[in-house]
């Protein structure tokens, strides 16, 4: 058997009908009694022979002897030799000062004893006794140490719970059982919720399909609509008729009403009392209530006098609200070049307007009028502001002259 990477030989010892693992060097009925505990606390280095119920209480016996004065016994070796079992004054620093069951060694020994672990040619045979007394042999050919470390504590097996491949049913703590029950509940509830959601969605689709096949709008008679509504009597209405009824409180008309057209019979014989025209886009009335055309009515409304007859035109003048391509070309010809951009006058326009531009042509300043500018209103970069000299600072105590860089040329702005 491999223990801590070193080979250790064990044999099967029996005592009072039980079986446990014990070292080959010493196997007695007192030392391998199942479920036995060391009742008295022993010093860190055991000075008297004691019973060791489990092989894990010992360290592997090496051939090298190390003699130091670290312990209380001068000249005593600290390694576990083969004569440690039953030999007095050999230290065993693997034997703690408290009870062994505090560290779980005896619990593990009891589990292996109750499970009936036998070692034979690197094969670990585990006989697990079920609640009904049936012995189920479980041969395991894996590493013995890894197998023994997986053995659980000896807990009475519930008859109602079967043996599972992962472990003994019911052999768990309260937290483990609660977590297992919660996990099993989750595993069973998840498919149920999924199935119920799927049934609900499929059932809802089927119900809506079957329930809407025989529906008909009582107003317009359609059978398909994004949303069915009801009128005041509870009858089904399509979405359009339902919304119309909700907003207007009466049934939606089946025929779309035509736009109101002016009756030509009514307007026959009407003429403007001012310019005597019979054609206009809109008839108006003057201050005396007589009908006038749109042009005469607007002129009287703005100027409070009648529109002169000389302003009458043959056709009706309309307003071009959108600039057509022809009009834009005409404006380009009138300007004598490309259209100017807003806020950025060109050289030709600036010369005609009397504005002097710097070399970069980015910013212009009028020579005739001073430029009113305050630092609070115009935030220029701090690198463009500087004083000419110290005398300027003394002379202009409140606000010295400001030098502003406009596109490469320095402009002296006197703010006083």
Swiss-Prot record:
InterPro entries xrefs: Transcription_factor_GATA, Znf_GATA, Znf_NHR/GATA
Subcellular location: Nucleus; Perikaryon; Cell projection, Axon
SMART domains attached to this UniProt entry: ZnF_GATA
Gene3D superfamilies: Erythroid Transcription Factor GATA-1, subunit A (3.30.50.10)
CDD domains xrefs: ZnF_GATA
Composition skew (Basic residues), residue ranges: 319-332
Name the record gives this protein: Transcription factor elt-1
Organism for this UniProt entry: Caenorhabditis elegans
């Amino acid at each position: 058997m491999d223990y801590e990477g070193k080979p250790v030989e064990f044999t099967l010892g029996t005592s009072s009908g039980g079986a446990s693992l014990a070292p080959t060097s010493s196997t007695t009925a007192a030392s391998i009694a199942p479920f036995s505990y060391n009742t008295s606390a022993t010093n860190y280095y055991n000075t008297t022979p004691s019973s060791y119920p489990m092989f894990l209480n010992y360290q592997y016996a090496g051939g090298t002897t190390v003699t130091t004065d670290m312990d209380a016994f001068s000249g005593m070796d600290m390694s576990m030799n083969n004569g440690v079992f039953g030999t007095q004054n050999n230290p065993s620093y693997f034997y703690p000062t408290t009870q062994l069951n505090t560290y779980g060694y005896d619990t593990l020994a009891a589990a292996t004893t109750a499970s009936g672990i036998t070692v034979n040619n690197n094969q670990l045979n585990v006989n697990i006794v079920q609640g009904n007394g049936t012995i189920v042999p479980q041969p395991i050919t894996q590493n013995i140490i890894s197998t023994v470390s997986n053995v659980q504590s000896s807990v009475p097996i519930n008859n109602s719970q079967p043996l599972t491949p992962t472990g003994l049913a019911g052999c768990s703590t309260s937290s483990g059982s609660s977590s297992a029950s919660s996990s099993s509940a989750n595993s069973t509830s998840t498919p149920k919720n999924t199935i119920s959601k799927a049934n609900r969605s499929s059932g809802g689709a089927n119900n809506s399909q079957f329930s809407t096949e025989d529906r008909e709008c009582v107003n317009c008679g359609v059978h398909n609509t994004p949303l069915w509504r009801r009128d005041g009597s509870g009858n089904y209405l399509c979405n359009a008729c339902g919304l119309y009824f909700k907003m207007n409180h009466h049934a939606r008309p089946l025929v779309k009403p035509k736009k109101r057209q002016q009756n030509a019979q009514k307007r026959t014989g009407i003429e403007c009392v001012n310019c005597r025209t019979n054609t206009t886009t809109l008839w108006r009335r003057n201050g005396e209530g007589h009908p006038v055309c749109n042009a005469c009515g607007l002129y009287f409304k703005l100027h409070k006098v009648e529109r002169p007859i000389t302003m009458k035109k043959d056709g009706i003048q309309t307003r071009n609200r959108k600039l057509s391509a022809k009009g834009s070309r005409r404006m380009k010809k009138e300007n004598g070049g490309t259209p100017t951009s807003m806020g950025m006058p060109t050289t030709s326009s600036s010369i005609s307007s009397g504005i002097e531009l710097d070399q970069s042509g980015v910013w212009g300043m009028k020579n005739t009028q001073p430029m009113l500018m305050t630092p609070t209103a115009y935030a220029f970069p701090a690198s463009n502001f500087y004083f000419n000299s110290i005398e300027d600072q003394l002379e202009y105590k409140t606000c010295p002259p400001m030098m502003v860089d406009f596109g490469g040329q320095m402009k002296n702005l006197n703010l006083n």
